[in-house]
């Protein structure tokens, strides 16, 4: 009589795993002011409202001539140029029966109510300007506040600053912005088979050795998200070394991210090491590649019991706890990359309080 096989583990679906993971990712509270020039990719800690209108006054959207439409009601008319208004200067009131030479971005002079583009004008030998087509009031004029009205919220709290957003912040005169502090992330790989590119030539590689590619792309991905990354290198395949690395990293980081060692082999030490210092809440998910994924907490004192879901009690227990979030990625590079994009990236953005 053969023994019954133990029931197979039911893997958590990706959507359920992500929802549970994000439940543990409470936004960081620290903020800092940084120069707008240096704020690319950072997340706003407060909304930005404009103290001015953009543009600040009516201005020309074309190179041409500012006119009074009433002066041109009779059709083709030749008028003298009474003034010249380049961008950055302010003209005088436009005299009746005259035009003002005006350039793109220059303020519309008082009395003018349209701009005729220079292609629709003929400059005669005597300097008079003949208008070929009668303009409509408001033609080629950008109105004050057309882009941004005074008091309008232009960027929301929790918005990640893009190059376009930085330009918008600068357009309302902001040289500095308040952003969420950078998450501190400790990164290390596990595996005695790993070697660093440049340290060993391909022809000198020992049988079974591979180059540590995960270290490079994971650090780059974290940096692009705005993290402050501590690269802790490669940890040997033994439990004591793994525990020591986790314990040390938990003292001064918000998140510990590892690659490798999260499966169920005899040389996979991440699971017991994390459980000895804290707890695991997620272990393996129903995706391929990427099944060997783990989430937990590393600290001197486990803030919640192992396996507790992201309930209000569990989340409350994490607040103020001494330690760090832990995420373990598979060692396979493709699996590691996929699980980072699907799970780690949204987790980090939630830590940053990102709303999109």
Where are these regions (language model features)?
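N-terminal intrinsically disordered, low-complexity, charge/repeat-rich segments that act as generic
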Residues: 1-21, 222, 255, 269-275
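Short, glycine/charged-enriched hinge/interface segments at domain edges or termini
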Residues: 2-12, 65-231, 236
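Flexible glycine/proline-rich
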Residues: 8-11, 15-18, 32-41, 45-46, ...
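Intrinsically disordered, low-complexity, positively charged segments
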Residues: 9-76, 160
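Short glycine-rich, flexible loops that bind phosphorylated cofactors or substrates
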Residues: 109, 163, 264-266, 335
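Short acidic, glycine/serine/threonine-rich loops at helix termini
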Residues: 112-114, 166-167, 196-202, 242-244, ...
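Acidic, glycine-rich loop-and-beta core segments that form the ion-binding/anion-interacting portion
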Residues: 215-292
């Amino acid at each position: 009589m053969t023994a019954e096989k133990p029931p197979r583990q039911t893997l958590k679906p990706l959507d359920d795993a992500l929802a549970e993971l994000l439940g543990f990712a409470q936004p960081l509270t620290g903020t800092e002011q940084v120069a707008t020039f240096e704020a690319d990719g950072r997340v706003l800690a407060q909304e930005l409202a404009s103290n001015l209108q953009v543009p600040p006054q009516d201005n020309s959207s074309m190179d041409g001539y500012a006119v009074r439409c009433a002066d041109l009601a009779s059709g083709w008319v030749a008028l003298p140029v009474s003034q010249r208004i380049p961008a950055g200067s302010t003209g005088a009131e436009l005299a009746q029966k005259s035009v003002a030479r005006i350039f793109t971005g220059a303020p519309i002079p008082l009395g003018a109510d349209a701009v005729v583009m220079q292609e629709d004008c003929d400059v005669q030998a005597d300097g008079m300007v003949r208008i070929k087509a009668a303009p409509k009031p408001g033609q080629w004029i950008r109105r004050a506040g057309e882009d941004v009205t005074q008091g309008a919220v232009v960027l929301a709290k929790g918005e990640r600053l893009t190059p376009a957003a930085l330009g918008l912040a600068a357009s309302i005169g902001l040289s500095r912005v308040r952003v969420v502090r950078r998450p501190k992330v400790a990164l290390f790989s596990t595996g005695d088979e790993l070697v660093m590119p440049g340290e060993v030539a391909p022809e000198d590689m020992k049988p079974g050795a591979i180059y540590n590619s995960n270290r490079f792309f994971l650090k780059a991905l974290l940096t692009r998200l705005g993290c402050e990354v501590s690269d802790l290198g490669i940890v040997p395949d033994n439990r004591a070394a793994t525990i020591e690395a986790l314990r040390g990293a938990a003292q001064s980081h918000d998140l510990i991210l590892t690659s490798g060692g999260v499966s169920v082999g005899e040389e996979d030490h991440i699971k017991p090491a994390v459980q000895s210092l804290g707890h695991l809440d997620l272990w393996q998910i129903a995706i391929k590649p990427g099944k060997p994924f783990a989430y937990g907490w590393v600290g001197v004192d486990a803030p919640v019991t192992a396996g507790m879901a992201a309930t209000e009690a569990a989340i409350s227990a994490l607040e103020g706890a001494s330690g760090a979030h832990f995420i373990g990625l598979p060692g396979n590079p493709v699996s590691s990359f996929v699980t980072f994009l699907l799970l780690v990236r949204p987790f980090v953005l939630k830590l940053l309080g990102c709303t999109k």
